[in-house]
Every structure is written in C-alpha cells, then in structure tokens.
UniProtKB/Swiss-Prot annotation:
Lineage, broadest ranks: Eukaryota, Metazoa, Chordata, Craniata, Vertebrata
Its biological purpose: With DHDDS, forms the dehydrodolichyl diphosphate synthase (DDS) complex, an essential component of the dolichol monophosphate (Dol-P) biosynthetic machinery. Both subunits contribute to enzymatic activity, i.e. condensation of multiple copies of isopentenyl pyrophosphate (IPP) to farnesyl pyrophosphate (FPP) to produce dehydrodolichyl diphosphate (Dedol-PP), a precursor of dolichol phosphate which is utilized as a sugar carrier in protein glycosylation in the endoplasmic reticulum (ER). Synthesizes long-chain polyprenols, mostly of C95 and C100 chain length.
UniProt-annotated binding residues for isopentenyl diphosphate: L295, G296
Composition bias, Basic residues: 63-73
Membrane topology: Multi-pass membrane protein
Miscellaneous note of the record: NUS1 seems to exist in two topological orientations, a minor glycosylated species with its C-terminus oriented towards the lumen regulating NPC2 stability, and a major fraction oriented with its C-terminus directed towards the cytosol where it regulates cis-IPTase activity.
Organism: Mus musculus
GO-annotated biological processes: angiogenesis; cell differentiation; cholesterol homeostasis; dolichol biosynthetic process; dolichyl diphosphate biosynthetic process; positive regulation of blood vessel endothelial cell migration; protein mannosylation; regulation of intracellular cholesterol transport
Known cofactor(s): Mg(2+)
Protein name: Dehydrodolichyl diphosphate synthase complex subunit Nus1
C-alpha cells in the first residue's frame, strides 16, 4: 500500500508541474500588462475629454433642487440618474451589463506587507456578494487572514452594514472556515472561505487517499488516474474551482493558492489591494466577461 501511495504522489506531482507552472506564469504576466494598458487608456481619455467637460458643463442646481448622489463606497459623489442614488441599484445595473459572472472568485494577496488590509479585503468580499458571486475565497501566503478569520468576518459584517444597509437583512450566507466546523452566518447569499498554503496541499492529499481507497476496493485501477478523475476527486472536497482570481501584488506567482484547481482559472493582476476601488473591481469583472475560455482546446 505504501508503494501505491508513493506512485500516486509522484504522478500528481508530475501533473501539477506540467499543467500549472507555464499557464500560471503566462496568465499572471499578461494580466499585469492588461491592467497597465487599461490604466493608460483611462488616463489618456480623461486628458482628451477634460476640456470638453469644462466647456459643456451645465450650471449646478441651487437651493432645494440640488441633489447629492452616493458612490458605491458610501461616500458622496456626483452622478445622474436613479441608479446612482443607491449603490445596490448601480450594482444590479452593472451585473446586467456583463455577459457572464464568475461563480467562484479568489482574492489572492501576494504583497509583502506587515499586515494586509482587512477593511479593503472585506469591501471586495461585500462587492462580490452584492453582484451575486456565490463563492469567495480569501488567501494570503502567510496565512494571516486564516489565523484572524474572526476579525475578517467582523470587518465583513461592518462593511455590509455600511454598503448594503437594510438590504442585508434579506439574505443569509455561510462563512466557511476549514479549521472550524461551526460555520457562522453572514447577511448575504454567498459562501466565504479563508485559505492558506496548507489547504491546497491538504486537498491533494485527501484526493490521493480517496483514489487509493477506490483502488483498494477494486473500483479503480492505478492506471485510471488522469486529469479529469483527479479534478472530480478534488471538487468533492469543497468549493467549485475558481473561475476568476484577483491577484494583488508584483509577484508573478500564485504562491500555492489551490495549485490544482486554478489550471483553467482566469487571473487578473492588480498592483495592490490597498485602497482598491469598486471601479477596479468591476473592471476585472468586465475583463473576465469578455474573455473567451477555450478550456484547453
């Protein structure tokens, strides 16, 4: 039985090297250039159109006819139309403009900081909930979020109240911590899981054990192990594979984030999660909605 375990582990290691290393590097590299290109285009458009804005600007309304609109962050900001008066209306309109929406989004922090921003990650989680993303994974390679998962949950609850207001009471969701079987309720229809480097390795070990059990029970042969079978064994142990990962930081690596499950994942790179804006978040969703996933074909 020991020899079978060793054989399975060697096969898994070879498959991981072949399927992940090159694809992960290329997607991270191209994702960074795409983000820089969008930023440059946005700045150029603003420089060209700014004079027209000053020339064609209408005079502001005064007195009791003047209105103030809300930004998705909860702060004041100008904007026409009823959708701007309530963040949730804007989020609904934004979602309708997308051709597709990820079912599972990963938030991957690779920055070398003393402590990541719990409030900024909580805002990202709440935005995911608001637009209808069903599964959200939060990961940092130092395991800070996982060690402080209760603090992160408190921050998410706080951000929900600030960004969603009374709408929070209409929903319920699951805060799934792999170290705590007593899941805690949140007030939005999504499941949130906090991960660390150990989780991806543990999933592969459990999948290998399941396969060895099937072989021992003569339900499978050792030669039956392939990409599809391993994927099905892994998916039976938790969330579906991520459709989209937002990677924050300059590191051209996913640093152990679910190494097998992201072989077909779209990765969008952003410089930092600090002071992340809703516009950057929605820009990543637009990029995902516009991409054509060939699934290896």
């Amino acid at each position: 039985m020991t020899g079978l375990y060793e054989l399975v582990w060697r096969v898994l290691h070879a498959l991981l090297c072949l399927h992940l290393t090159l694809t992960s590097w290329l997607r991270v590299r191209f994702g960074t250039w795409n983000w820089i290109w969008r930023r440059c285009c946005r700045a150029a458009s603003a420089a060209v159109l700014a004079p027209l804005g000053f020339t064609l600007r209408k005079p502001r309304a005064v007195g009791r006819n003047r209105r103030h609109h809300r930004h998705p962050h909860g702060g004041p900001g100008p904007g026409p139309g009823p959708a701007a008066t309530h963040p949730r209306l804007r989020w609904r309109a934004d979602v309708r403009s997308l051709q597709k929406l990820p079912v599972h989004m990963g938030l991957l922090v690779t920055e070398e900081v003393q402590e990541p921003s719990f409030s900024d990650i909580a805002s990202l989680v709440v935005w995911c909930m608001a637009v209808g993303i069903s599964y959200i994974s939060v990961y940092d390679h130092q395991g800070i979020f996982k060690r402080n998962n209760s603090r992160l949950m408190d921050e998410i609850l706080k951000q929900q109240q600030e960004l969603l207001g009374q709408d929070c009471s209409k929903y319920s969701a699951e805060f799934a911590n792999s170290n705590d079987k007593d899941d805690q309720d949140l007030n939005c229809p999504s499941a949130v899981k906090v991960l660390s480097p150990e989780d991806g390795k543990a999933d592969i070990v459990r999948a290998a054990q399941d396969f060895c059990q099937l072989v021992a029970q003569q339900q499978r042969k050792p030669t039956d192990l392939d990409v599809d079978l391993l994927g099905s064994l892994l998916s039976s142990h938790g969330f579906p594979d991520p459709d989209l990962v937002l990677k924050f930081g300059p590191v051209d690596s996913t640093l152990g984030f679910l190494p097998w499950q992201i072989r077909l994942t779209e990765i969008v790179s952003l410089p930092s999660h600090l002071n992340i804006s809703y516009e950057d978040f929605f820009s990543a969703l637009r990029q995902y909605a516009a991409c054509e996933q060939r699934l290896g074909k």
